[in-house]
Curated annotation (Swiss-Prot):
It comes from Maridesulfovibrio salexigens (strain ATCC 14822 / DSM 2638 / NCIMB 8403 / VKM B-1763) (Desulfovibrio salexigens). Keywords: Cytoplasm, Methylation, Protein biosynthesis. It comes from the Bacteria. Belongs to the prokaryotic/mitochondrial release factor family. Peptide chain release factor 1 directs the termination of translation in response to the peptide chain termination codons UAG and UAA. This is Peptide chain release factor 1. The keyword Transcription does not apply. One of its GO terms (cellular component) is cytoplasm. InterPro entries: PCRF, Pep_chain_release_fac_I, Pep_chain_release_fac_I_sf, Prokaryotic/Mito_RF, RF-1. Gene3D superfamilies: 3.30.160.20, 3.30.70.1660, 6.10.140.1950. It is found in: Cytoplasm. HAMAP family: Rel_fac_1. GO terms for molecular function: translation release factor activity, codon specific. Methylated by PrmC. Methylation increases the termination efficiency of RF1.
Length: 357
């Protein structure tokens, strides 16, 4: 681990030198990339430097603890105790900082909540979940924008979709995907019986706008004379353009303009629009598949968490965590729940890393 940390520190110092280089500073794209790389390594380098400093201080204090002056010895022993308490914690921090980063962690999210088993009660629960997430977002300074909703007449939602934007949202919210189960007595229940309902939650990183990269070698451009009704030639010059995108087989023809250059520009614009749409369709298909994998069918048995109102508890079944503060959680006080999930999955990743060597 420490050899890897030494390599990271060297890379960090190289990046610092690059940032001080006027040539890099004057190249906006290069400067942006170097700044991002430098910032990404900042936390781990700071922790490693603290670890090295504390290790050196420990050795110094061990020497001071041999001093003939009892006051110096006492002071050194106090320092040694503090350092020995801090070093193991710092080592654990470093292990976490060395875990591979999820490239999606910094992204905004799309939140989708759908009522599952349980009819109107499930729709009301979906509304409760949306309010819970909205208030949690508000407490973190995030922005929530409803994209689409299918409300019921009693204040529930068959479905609600929202975009949530802010800082590192996906890293905190990604473990919310799955089936959430509620156990409570519905307002319409006259016998006081507890009903079980469910809603599914999908958390997806918000897709960036797709940049269309069209390489010249991927295009075949043919020029020909524009034709009018009945195939007659309406132009004596080869101004019409046919562009074929070889990797996809998409073909665009433009012959409205008398200028070949204008026809080519129009055809390229149409081609790029079609390629962009095709890429977005592909992303949507992948997102739909991801959603299916995440949330299951909405059946009560496929649960990640249970909200039991009569007992005032919320239980996350993945990490066997039960909190007896359901009222606070459902009002958006989710920090303990979220941090426990992050900590659990970080521990799992550390175990996996140790097994992989």
């Amino acid at each position: 681990m420490f050899a890897k940390l030494e390599d990271i520190e060297r890379s960090f110092m190289d990046l610092e030198q690059e940032l001080a280089d006027p040539e890099v500073y004057n190249n906006q794209e290069r400067y942006r990339k170097v700044t991002m790389a430098h910032a990404e390594l900042g936390d781990v380098v700071a922790a490693f430097r603290e670890y090295k400093q504390l290790s050196a201080d420990l050795e110094d204090n061990k020497e001071m603890a041999k001093d003939s002056d009892p006051e110096i010895r006492e002071m050194a022993e106090m320092e040694i105790a503090e350092i020995k308490d801090r070093l193991p914690k710092l080592e654990e921090e470093l292990k976490l900082l060395l875990l591979p980063k999820d490239p999606m962690d910094g992204k905004n999210i799309i939140l989708e909540i759908r009522a599952g088993t349980g009819g109107e009660e499930a729709a009301l629960f979906a509304a409760d979940l949306f309010r819970m997430y909205s208030r949690f977002a508000e407490s973190n300074g995030w922005k929530v924008e409803v994209m689409n909703s299918n409300p019921t007449g009693t204040g529930g939602f068959k479905e609600i979709i929202a975009a949530i934007s802010g800082s590192r949202i996906y890293s905190m919210m990604k473990y919310e995907s799955g089936t959430h189960r509620v156990q409570r007595v519905p307002a319409t229940e006259t016998q006081g019986r507890i009903h079980t309902s469910a809603a599914t939650v999908a958390i997806m990183p918000e897709a960036e706008e797709v940049d269309v990269q069209v390489r010249n070698e991927d295009l075949r451009i043919d020029v020909f004379r524009a034709s009018g009704p009945g195939g007659q030639s309406v132009n004596t010059t080869d101004s019409a353009i046919r562009i074929t995108h070889l990797p996809t087989g998409l073909v665009v023809i433009c012959q409205d303009e008398k200028s070949q250059h204008k026809n080519k520009a129009k055809a390229m614009k149409v081609l790029c629009s079609r390629l962009l749409q095709a890429e977005q369709d592909k992303q949507h298909a992948e997102m739909a598949e991801q959603r299916r994998a995440q949330v299951g069918s909405g059946d009560r048995s496929e649960r990640i968490r249970t909200y039991n109102f009569p007992q005032g508890r919320v239980t996350d079944h993945r990490i066997n965590l039960t909190l007896y503060k359901l009222d606070a959680v459902i009002e958006g006080d989710m920090q303990e729940l979220v941090e426990s999930l992050i900590s659990h999955y970080q521990s799992e990743a550390l175990k996996q890393q140790a097994q992989d060597g």
